[in-house]
Amino acid sequence: MKKKDFDVITILIGIIVGAFIGYFIGHSTENTQPVINPTQETGYVYLLQLAKYDNPDGAINFQTLAKNKGFDVEIVYDGVYYIYGAIGISEESLSQIKLSYEAKGYSCIVRKEYMLDLPNSIIDDQYAYDFYLECINNLINSLSNEQIIISDKYYIEPVNLELFSTLTILQTIQNSSLKARAQLQAYRLLVQNLK
C-alpha cells in the first residue's frame, strides 16, 4: 500500500466514524430535551367564556339568567361584553366546570389570555405598575394553589382598594367555590383597570 492510499482510507474511516458519533450524539440530546408542558406557560390564564355581547343590557340579562340557574358569572368589558363563568391556570382545570355549564344548556369556549403585559398601559406610574404586576402574579399564584404574598407597602397605600381587598380574601379564604368567584372577580378588576 502506498502512502497516498493509506491517507484516503484514513480519511474515509474518519468520516464514517464521525458520522456515527454525530448521529448517536444527536439522538441522545434529542431524547433528553425537556418536554414543554403548555400548563407551565408563565403569565397565561384560561377563561371559560359563556357569551359575548355588544351591549351591556344583553350581558346583564344573561348574567341574571345564569344566576337564576345557580351560576355566578362575571361581565368583563374588553371592547365587547364577555361573560365568563370560570378562570383557571390550564384548560384541563376548567374541564369539569365546562361540563356542568354544558349540562345546563350553555355553549362554552375556553379562551387563553396572557396577563403579564396588562400593566404596560400604566408603565409611567411605577408604583401603580408594580402594584398591578404583583396583583397579576398573585392571581396566577392563587390559580396554581401557591402562596399569595402581598407587599407591606400596599397594606398602607393600595393603588386599587377593591382589587387589594379581593387579593387579601384570596390570601386567606378556604371555601373553594368562594375562592373561584374571587379569582374571577380579581381578573375582572384587572382588565377593568388596565385596558
Task: Please annotate each region the language model reported.
Residues 1-195:
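Acidic/polar low-complexity segments and flexible, solvent-exposed patches
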